[in-house]
From Swiss-Prot:
<dbReference type="InterPro" id="IPR027756">
    <property type="entry name" value="Ovo-like"/>
</dbReference>
<comment type="similarity">
    <text>Belongs to the krueppel C2H2-type zinc-finger protein family.</text>
</comment>
<feature type="zinc finger region" description="C2H2-type 2">
    <location>
        <begin position="98"/>
        <end position="120"/>
    </location>
</feature>
<feature type="zinc finger region" description="C2H2-type 3">
    <location>
        <begin position="126"/>
        <end position="149"/>
    </location>
</feature>
<keyword id="KW-0677">Repeat</keyword>
<dbReference type="GO" id="GO:0006357">
    <property type="term" value="P:regulation of transcription by RNA polymerase II"/>
</dbReference>
<keyword id="KW-0862">Zinc</keyword>
<feature type="region of interest" description="Disordered">
    <location>
        <begin position="35"/>
        <end position="65"/>
    </location>
</feature>
<dbReference type="Pfam" id="PF00096">
    <property type="entry name" value="zf-C2H2"/>
</dbReference>
<dbReference type="GO" id="GO:0005634">
    <property type="term" value="C:nucleus"/>
</dbReference>
<feature type="compositionally biased region" description="Polar residues">
    <location>
        <begin position="41"/>
        <end position="62"/>
    </location>
</feature>
<protein>
    <recommendedName>
        <fullName>Putative transcription factor ovo-like protein 3</fullName>
    </recommendedName>
</protein>
<keyword id="KW-0539">Nucleus</keyword>
<keyword id="KW-0479">Metal-binding</keyword>
<dbReference type="Pfam" id="PF13465">
    <property type="entry name" value="zf-H2C2_2"/>
</dbReference>
<comment type="function">
    <text>May act as a transcription regulator.</text>
</comment>
<dbReference type="GO" id="GO:0000981">
    <property type="term" value="F:DNA-binding transcription factor activity, RNA polymerase II-specific"/>
</dbReference>
Length: 190
């Protein structure tokens, strides 16, 4: 298994999924995270988020770095849109608002936590139609298709791809939001 998919655990011997074929890895295996002892203790309240808690830090302004770009005041990166700069500024903050309940790793963005949780659950919703190998991320599937099967991306640069709705409880996938909503209702009813 590539190192990118390995996650450190406080468990003495983490579960080894290497012997499982991809067909079984795609099915839901949700470990009991309570056995890991929960996430590490929150940071003390004396540690403050410099981006929201202190008004004196509110004077961080983005310096234009060229026509139509906004520069980060803390590093040399530049962005075409304010929302992209705002998202980037979170990477400089020491506070991680989204904590993994299994290992305690923190993330700035809720989606990054959702993607990380797949390393614990084993859910691999992106399956190769040619060989059946499954992946946790769409970009990994696309790289596999290009390298192994020689299939170039079937979309143009910056073209929006079809969204895949993934149930993080059981691994169910659907490209239709109404089908996904019906499936989620089954989990709530149970």
């Amino acid at each position: 298994m590539p190192r990118a998919f390995l996650v450190r655990s406080r468990r003495p011997q983490p579960p080894n999924w290497g012997h499982l074929p991809d067909q079984l890895r795609g099915d839901a295996y949700i470990p009991d995270c309570s056995s890991l002892g929960g996430p590490p203790a929150q940071q003390s309240s004396s540690v403050r988020d410099p981006w929201t808690a202190q008004p004196t830090q509110g004077n961080l302004t983005s310096a234009p770095r060229g026509p139509g770009t906004l520069g980060c005041p803390l590093c040399p990166k530049a962005f075409p849109l304010q929302r992209m700069l705002t998202r980037h500024l979170k990477c400089h903050s020491p506070v991680r608002r989204h904590l993994c309940r299994c290992c305690g790793k923190g993330f700035h963005d809720a989606f990054d936590l959702k993607r990380h949780m797949r390393t614990h659950t084993g859910i691999r919703p992106f399956r190769c139609s040619a060989c059946g190998k499954a992946f946790t991320q769409r970009c990994s599937l696309e790289a596999h298709l290009a390298k192994v099967h020689g299939q170039p991306a079937s979309y143009a640069y910056r073209e929006r791809r079809e969204k895949l709705h993934v149930c993080e409880d059981c691994g169910f996938t659907s490209s239709r939001p109404d089908t996904y909503a019906q499936h989620r209702a089954l989990h709530r009813a149970a």
